[in-house]
């Protein structure tokens, strides 16, 4: 996944809008999730307040808490991708936990790739084709331009094609109702 330019606006001391930063955001990768790249473009752990200076809010976990959000791109390798030896080692998994804090803890042991978070995820497939799997065993194939709204349900993403899949997500922290 390439790096992406990020332009951020804010307000000057007089409340006038201005560009406060114009730079490049680099993707995050980890040997513990081989072939997966994520680019965290913006996020916050609480509601935005304006006017502001446009400084990037601090946040520490992959998934936002209630009232928070993340704006992330995600790439998934093609079906014929072979993970490098050692990618399942303790060291590689520890690296993945540091690189994508809170992500691996949402995965289920009994269904590879299946995970659940307390978020509403709005996703857009930018390129490629990906299969959305759900806990009931259903699968939905999504292609470039398709969107999905993921409402805190257990799901997985599988790339069965020969091309890398790239998706754009807005994750919004949500409250989970008692069952």
How would you name each of these model-derived features?
Residues 1-59:
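N-terminal leader/capping segments at the start of a protein or of a new domain
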Residues 7, 11-12, 16-21, 98, ...:
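Double-stranded beta-helix
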Residues 109-143:
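A short beta-strand-loop-beta hairpin characteristic of the jelly-roll/cupin
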Residues 25, 71-117, 151-154:
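Conserved short histidine dyad/triad with adjacent acidic residue
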Residues 20, 133, 149-150:
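A generic structural signal for residues embedded in beta-strands
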Residues 69, 77, 137-139, 143-146, ...:
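Ligand-binding loop in jelly-roll beta-barrel domains
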Residues 4-6, 68-71, 117-120, 129, ...:
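Extracellular structured ligand-interaction cores
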Residues 13, 21-25, 47-51, 65-81, ...:
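Glyoxalase I/VOC metalloenzyme domain signal
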